[in-house]
Amino acid sequence: MDTLLKIVQTINMYLSDYVLIILLLGAGLYFTIRTKFVQVRCFGEGWRRFFGEFSLNGEKHKSGMSSFQALATAVAAQVGTCNIVGACGAILIGGPGAIFWMWIIAFFGMATIYAEAVLAQETRVVEPDGTVLGGPVYYIKRAFPKGFGKFLAGFFAVAIILALGFMGSMVQSNSIGEACQNAFHIPSWVMGLIVSAIAAFIFIGGVQRIASVTEKIVPIMACLYLLGGLIVLIARIRYVPETFGMIFKYAFAPQSIIGGGIGYALKTAISQGAKRGLFSNEAGMGSTPHAHALANVKSPHEQGTVAMIGVFIDTFVVLTMTALVVICTLYAGNGPLAHGAVDGISKTNMAQLAFSSVFGETLGNAFVAICLLFFAFSTIVGWNLFGRINVNYLFGKKANLAYSIIAIIFIFLGSCLSNDLVWELTDMFNQLMVLPNMIALVALSGIVAVAARKHNDEHELRK
């Protein structure tokens, strides 16, 4: 077992540090050019569509979702424990400058996720009973109609079911169990039972219940976390300018805070920012297109602009709030990490220490635990939907109940078990599913360019 663990860890290291960073950043640059900077040109349009659709009690649809429900479901999956623990890890290893590189990655990722949403809309399938299905498996088969496409789509479907539907849920429920046990002394297995029961109620309700839950939970959890972060920043407002200064300073000269030569330090800052940013906003990963395919919109371009807002919310709002709070309290003002890592502070407790510096230990730990609970549970709900669509693709609707039952078992087991191999396998399948998704995106990039150009031409005619 130890040998297998080492093999999987080695595969993950090469995938995350080299293959995926080059692939995903390259795709972001490529689609930025092909769409003529759609993330800049249509940024305002995306927000207008977001606020135009915003609702905590959205209209019920016989099939699919509203545009806002689709975005809420996507954001539910995007905004997870990585927005807290992942951001802390990037800062601890790569220094405050890692956040700058997260912003750069997210900017280009907005073009990639636009492409994913457009293709998901273009290739979605409406079944005779009105059920809407869509996602990478459908545009992979459009890109490669023969045997190769069938193989790639099948590979993607299996990878995402394992990575998100089953093992990924274990990782998220484990975070919930640990957070609540540390903050409230509730046994992790008890939280596992509670989370599993609530998840079962949602899963059995199908797509409509998932949409109804995510459109309510996402605005609440985001506002709660941002409010707590704002309180900390206001309390430490004299250090906010220094915080932004550290982000930009250590983006290009991180060696003084993380050690090593300038080349090694700069590589570490960039790789940590890129890796954590990519895995947080999921642009190019092939997960969120499942939600965007279900949106009932007039044109694929419309949902593409809304999808970009998901990346912005995840990285430029929620993840950035974590970064500002942590840097403002633990780095700025000659904080405990101002001169590098110290014993007793790790990525798993940085957020608690940061919020506790203003809220006090008890309230700070409780606040982070509650936010982690919201973030992790919403991710479980979103990921379950993505896995369900791929189960339908492979086995048909008859397998939905069995899939939900297995997912619920994994959620409970994850709350009270900690297995490094499971965590590493989750990362491996999560990264492997990027490969077929990216191949199909590039192969169908002409469709994306046409959608962006058509909107641009129509906009010019209206002037």
Regions inferred by a protein language model and the residue ranges of each:
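N-terminal alpha-helical transmembrane segments of multi-pass membrane transport
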Residues: M1-T81, I91-A98, G109, F412, ...
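Membrane-interface loop-to-helix entry segments
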Residues: L23-Y30, R34, V38-W47, F156, ...
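Flexible loop linkers connecting adjacent transmembrane helices
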Residues: F37-M65, G89, G95-P96, A111-G147, ...
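Alpha-helical membrane segments and immediately flanking helix-loop junctions
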Residues: G58-L92, L119-E122, P128-V137, K141-A143, ...
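Selective recognition of specific alpha-helical transmembrane segments in multi-pass small-molecule
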Residues: F108-E116, L193-V207, V218-R238, S271, ...
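Extracellular/periplasmic helix-exit of transmembrane alpha-helices
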Residues: A115-P128, L230-M246, P254, I258-G261, ...
